[in-house]
Amino acid sequence: MSKITRRGFFQHAGIVTAGGIALSGALPGLVSTPARAQPAPDRLALTKALEPELPIIDPLHPALTESTAQAAEQPEPLQPIVFENVLGEYGPWAKKMLGDGPAKLSFLRDEFNRGGIDAWRKKARARLLECLAMPDSGGIPKAQVMHQVEFEGLSIQQLQWQLPYGPPTKAMFLKPANAKGKLPAILALHDHSGKKYFGHSKISRASSDVDPLIKQHVDENYGGVWWANQMARRGYAVLAPDAFLFGSRRIRLSQVPQIMSGLLVEGNPDNALDIVAYNRWARQHEHDVAKSLLCAGTTMPGVVVGEDQRALDYLCSREDVDVSRVGCCGLSSGGLRTLFLAGLDDRIAAACCVGMMTTWRDFCLNKSYTHTWMIYPPGLPRDLDYPEILGLRVPLPTLVQNAEHDQLYTLREMQRADRMLADIYKKAGVESQYQSAFYPGTHRFDLKMQTDAFTWLDSKLAKR
């Protein structure tokens, strides 16, 4: 593969990263026909090609600060040397605004202590909710069972419920066939991956008849395993809902102005080219959705978290679920959804965040171009750093899994976020309730990570 420059990268419409979206140009000529549709780009190859062009450079590195005879011969630059970052010359200014922490409402500040943890949590959660500006998403959803089947030893219900807005939400509920009594439960949260045509089907299935694009996605990101099904086989009741803008909750091309959809039309759901074309369009359209939601007085993360809370409401309302033993888990934006939901809702007795841990500094300076608008509550970074959202659940059990070569974050900031969470739990006197691990490799939730995560969830949620 030839080297891709940054200019070429951003001109390549529809570039995908496993964790979210990349900035891309307009797609006015994209149509879902074999003659004009473009194949999905190799997102890992593109990201790796870009990485050497986006180094994290320390402005205090000796190479930039030491005087040398050669440097003395050079004319003084008109502007000070700026470390390369997303914001260019504005980067140092943005970094200074963020500061080195702790943020205003961080539990790590001296004014907060173990004895006042409940008061601190109440204040910090109130600020988070203010920034999220969550819309009214109704009460406990009234789910309809659309189809029920037994598959590979599991009893599976395909569900549907209607929120106060948008198309019906589809979800899959799984548990062991012939299970009796109340079961521990998992809210299984699917990823983003720039593939909005699909939702919960990226992590759960009810038959062997699977779309080839989903199969490829599961092979690449989950070791070939639909992990929601795996959790159900371990004795859990598992609910996997579609998130806002995904699967059943996606925006239909026929319902937006033609100037936005171009020549694209609703295609054949069995045609891979049509699905890829939609996903490319939807990645670009997410920018417009985020702006429109802000104009409506809400935020994309606020909508997503609110809908996940309604799914949790439904899960906890079921007679076959033990509400004292409910956990949640997800990779990438599923990890993001875990972070927000578990940080806000104490019904989550155990939370596993996979491949979605870093800091606001990392997003701001290094990696915002690789991520979705679902991450950013306006105004929050001065009050809470990103990992501290998950830290709001202290002292409840929390597991964070990271990949050492995750292309969506810098290792330095992943490690800094890990230390931040560990320090929060240590200050609260419950150091053992926080666990984390760094795995070799890139962004994924592979079989080794799944085994470790599921074993940990068993230790927190299984009957004693």
Predicted feature locations:
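N-terminal export signals
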Residues: S2, F10-V31
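N-terminal targeting or regulatory segments adjacent to alpha/beta-hydrolase or S9 domains
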Residues: F10, A37-S155, L163, G199
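Proline/glycine-enriched tight loop/beta-turn segments at coil->beta junctions
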Residues: G166-P168, A177-A185
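Mobile cap/lid helix-loop segments that gate and shape the active-site cleft of serine hydrolases
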Residues: R283-A311, R325, A349-L390, P395, ...
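C-terminal catalytic histidine-bearing segment of alpha/beta-hydrolase fold enzymes
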Residues: W373, R419-M420, I424-R464
